């Protein structure tokens, strides 16, 4: 679907580690190792940096080098409130978007090189920019989105480049809030469509010429008559269907084979599919297509007929590993489902097995859920996918106030029903007493847009997951509503306990912010390393602390949004958790080696880069300002940059 639908909590921010080109430093720098030239650092979306100056031996000494304010946005109360920008570093310059401008900075100091004040229709991307290196006839360009507009700036001057599109602009047709991925002279973008109604803008993936801005191709995310997969939409349900979009922050490309991989979310509407019987391709799928033509090569659908809002937000990571003596080209895809799908990226076939397993069926009028869903044999689930009554939080886990709230919530909800993975929401007749499904993972995951980082040398894939429920039922909506059936619950959009020191709040509050705790026993968030050679967990640790709890109980793991990056120095860096921390872990063992506390949580992707001074830096956007966080004082959203003394 579009970003996040019915949500219990939310916040976003981007962790970054930038990498400017150090022209006269080392051979590594000359080879591009010093840079972070795109959102996920490379076309394969590994977020792996070969820099190793900062290592397991010295990371404990990491200290703030400089910072740069990126905005004054106030808490919006929604999951999309704060900055999610990942800066990029290309040819010795850092580029990023703030809340109002596109800026170029000196990556060693934060000195402003130029500023482009964004204006006109559409919202400036809160996720960053792309860099195209130019050619003999065109200068290097910084390319970004504003609603339906794709805009190209001269990377050296920050001025609009009139040679791109129509005086520097291209109309994409559908809004997109992320930077395009740049492959050779092709720009590929997703789409941000609404959550409802079922008809509206298409979620198609599109490509444009990086030189001229001309449209190159468009892939129909909902197959049209005569196209592969059209029969998975019964009757006329395909017509003008919205959703089924790549709303995430990037795509991936196998440069050797010229294949671009796009992912799609579920169809509109989120929780009822009675007007769209069938498996609904290419919803909830990863699709491999020819980067030059947009022609489908293969697809893999991870959820059939989605009625849980189980999108595939992140780009897949591409890496090669040796399995049973043979080099295998892997594609590693995560999703809100809480599973990791490891496929051969050339054929689309599962590497460790994925089985179609029977799942519970919906009793909502008109609904026809799929009798089976694809469940990986390996790796194990990354997030909780079931719930039993004795797994509700107790005073021994946190405190009595929290435990009582959760017991009361279960009672007010009419009890909790859970039948394991893909439990359908219960149906509530008008006037009937409430009885609620408790669904794990909930609608924020699982694994959300933060995705994974992959170390191709070690063969490990790193991912942060969320153990958070959605609670409620499906009910018929009044005539005139945008949907016939939709979700509801006894507590509105959230179902978490809000803690206030000395004054626990009653159960009718929204349960948002840093002091809102889930009702199942911890951990509530984890950082996991998966051995891509075997499909097994290498290690798993709680990610985040609850400061209000006493020693011995603090390490609960936290709700998180954002993702990791990994370096040749043996380190995994990640913000993401809503406890205002930025951390470094040993990539081999999962041992935490460093942390710093910031003004706001960093729901973003970190980056690392080497400056022209030969020093390695680590950077991340500390943005907060959403429903995962407490309200932020104006001006606290910042780019935070760290280095060794």
Regions inferred by a protein language model and the residue ranges of each:
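Extracytoplasmic/lumenal domain signature
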Residues: 58-71, 102-123, 133-136, 149-173, ...
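Bacterial N-terminal signal peptides
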Residues: 8-19
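Mature N-terminal segment immediately following signal peptide/propeptide cleavage
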Residues: 26-73, 86-89, 111, 528
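N-terminal pre-domain segments of enzymes
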Residues: 23-54, 370-407
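Segments forming glycine/polar-rich beta-alpha architectures that bind adenosine-containing cofactors
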Residues: 431-467
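N-terminal secretory signal peptides that target proteins for export/translocation
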Residues: 1-5
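Repeat-blade elements of multi-bladed beta-propeller folds
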Residues: 36-40, 80-100, 123-149, 176-197, ...
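Short helix/loop capping segments that flank catalytic or ligand/cofactor-binding pockets
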Residues: 198, 217, 261-263, 270-271, ...
